[in-house]
Amino acid sequence: MTNRIVLAYSGGLDTTVAIPYLKKMIDGEVIAVSLDLGQGGENLDNVRQRALDAGAAESIVVDAKDEFAEEYCLPTIKANGMYMKQYPLVSAISRPLIVKHLVEAGKQFNGTHVAHGCTGKGNDQVRFEVGFMDTDPNLEIIAPARDFAWTRDKAIAFAEENNVPIEQSVKSPFSIDQNVWGRAIETGYLEDLWNAPTKDIYAYTEDPALGNAPDEVIISFEGGKPVSIDGRPVSVLQAIEELNRRAGAQGVGRLDMVEDRLVGIKSREIYEAPGAIALIKAHEALEDVTIERELARYKRGVDARWAEEVYDGLWFGPLKRSLDAFIDSTQEHVTGDIRMVLHAGSITINGRRSSHSLYDFNLATYDTGDTFDQTLAKGFVQLHGLSSKIANKRDREAGNN
């Protein structure tokens, strides 16, 4: 039986070099699978051809933009998905979708192995391999960059020696991953934490200091899902794309952070996610208006745990599924409009309205028409602080003994 290796193919250095390397090491055919996740940039027909030129027996490009937006970005919006309160899971949410399509290709082509180009230092090896284990444990997993101790310099040298078509060079060694949800840049001079990122590494965002005129936008949601922008109906994909343009033009969505990786190391990452950040901020603001206090407080903890599960590669795990069910149950009333101003790298929320709002003007106002019964407050305060009062009394008495 012929070994058929289904490869997660990005068109970049590691996976392009992996094609001829796997053919030699495993003595089999390579099926390269690439996904269009709205990353833009290079024409994917060129990516497909590069895989064939590198020796792939088949090269498949899947248009998965809408699927990615509806089934992966939307749950992230509902969960306000921010790892370490900053990173909107740009790469992390794309990996389970890639896993899904690789497994499908494995079934189509009678695949015996599945391969990825991740190193042993990153999170993606975990996301891919746990995903394969969860969805098709019969596929044997190969990770050439990790298992055969490839470094980036060695990969470049191998490509040059074997005439493998790549766009990477020793002078520009950044590792870049991008999709419609955002863009991630790492390695190179960024590995020195004191080096500031230069303007040329950014592609999704303009310099916040350019001084563009402020852009006011109204984002409307139904059940936690963005459905219109400035009154125009949009799909989730269209919402992300439009806000990528508009927020990106204002320099919104740039992140420079030191991230706690799953494998135990800290890593410096640069992210651009203008549309993602704008949508999550708008969604959070609408939740503030429409979700009851105790539920909102509890959901914030669930959101943080959800982001950790996704970051850690457990998209298909039972806890993630249960968290999804809880989060979905909270979105029933997250319907309404959020008005925000995008300007100079910042987002300012300046308007909120919802037919499901829990904000009661007559209870909140300090002016005439106030319906809040302040006579109830004194007893409430006494009861609220009673247990703390008793504990502090005990501690004072114990200190006097």
From Swiss-Prot:
Gene assigned in the entry: argG
Keywords associated with the record: Amino-acid biosynthesis, Arginine biosynthesis, ATP-binding, Cytoplasm, Ligase, Nucleotide-binding
Complex formation: Homotetramer.
The UniProt record lists the keyword ATP-binding: yes
Organism: Corynebacterium glutamicum (strain R)
Binding locations of L-aspartate: T119, N123, D124
Taxonomy, superkingdom: Bacteria
Pathway(s) served: Amino-acid biosynthesis; L-arginine biosynthesis; L-arginine from L-ornithine and carbamoyl phosphate: step 2/3
Binding site for ATP: A8, Y9, S10, G11, G12, L13, D14, T15, T16, G117
Single GO MF annotation: argininosuccinate synthase activity
Catalytic activity: L-citrulline + L-aspartate + ATP = 2-(N(omega)-L-arginino)succinate + AMP + diphosphate + H(+)
Record-linked NCBIfam families: argG, PRK00509.1
Positions that bind L-citrulline: Y87, N123, R127, S175, E259, Y271
Disulfide feature: none
UniProt protein name: Argininosuccinate synthase
